[in-house]
Amino acid sequence: MNVFGQIVDYKSSFTRSHSFSVAEKVTKMARFYGYDESTVERMYIAGVLHDIGKMAVSNDILEKPAKLSETEFAYMQTHAWYTYVILSQINGFEDITEWASLHHEKLNGSGYPFGKTGKDMSEKDRLVACVDIYQALSEDRPYKKGMDHAKCMSIMRDMASRGLIDARITEDIDKKLSGEKRSENRHK
């Protein structure tokens, strides 16, 4: 699985370690929640592969150094659908497919690719989504500098207060990840 994560991460210089950072943090949180080791390992795989659909997205979009247009953003959003399409072809990956492909869903139904609501999302779906947000906020991207833990948590708490992401998982991320330094993915 790691080779697929490496391919995804190396597709764009600005997400060079994103998939593995998500996988590592998802693993820490899964252990924090006391999931059995088999589930922890499967969640790690979901973290590594959650952006595999970006292989279908042009690097011109992935590395654009400015805000995406509405059309470009809609195109970028297709990566979550392609993650679902790719992973759903693998027998025995049903749970991994769900956790990986729902990482942009929001509890109020405003997310993508399926517009699921909180009642349709498991705790593990919500966990991968929250960790992906945390990781994305902490990383440098073509259009922004990475944020420190306190700023990431402020944004995530705001999102939780608006019913977008799970408030309990957000607070648990603060407890478990507060001592970690910002992402090593720095670009000067």
Report residues per predicted region:
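Histidine- and acidic-residue-rich, metal-dependent catalytic cores
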Residues: 1-188
